[in-house]
From Swiss-Prot:
The chain crosses the membrane at residues 24-44. The keyword Transferase does not apply. It is found in: Plastid, Chloroplast thylakoid membrane. It is a single-pass membrane protein. Keywords: Chloroplast, Membrane, Photosynthesis, Photosystem II, Plastid, Reaction center, Thylakoid, Transmembrane, Transmembrane helix. GO terms for biological process: photosynthesis. It holds the Pfam family PsbK. The gene is psbK. SUPFAM superfamilies: Photosystem II reaction center protein K, PsbK. PSII is composed of 1 copy each of membrane proteins PsbA, PsbB, PsbC, PsbD, PsbE, PsbF, PsbH, PsbI, PsbJ, PsbK, PsbL, PsbM, PsbT, PsbX, PsbY, PsbZ, Psb30/Ycf12, at least 3 peripheral proteins of the oxygen-evolving complex and a large number of cofactors. It forms dimeric complexes. This is Photosystem II reaction center protein K. InterPro entries: PSII_PsbK, PSII_PsbK_sf. Residues 1-8 form a propeptide.
Length: 45
């Protein structure tokens, strides 16, 4: 919870990193999809 409050009060200097912070939680899902596509490509050996 403190992390959310910290991110809400980010200094202006870090404003350019805000899109990266917004996208960060989605990255593990992309890895999961990548693993599935890879297994489909090799035929689920």
């Amino acid at each position: 919870m403190e992390g959310i409050l910290f991110l809400a009060k980010l200094p202006e200097a870090y404003a350019i990193f805000k899109p990266i912070i917004d996208v960060a939680p989605v990255i593990p899902v992309f890895f999961l999809l990548l693993a599935f596509v890879w297994q489909a490509a090799v035929g689920f050996r």
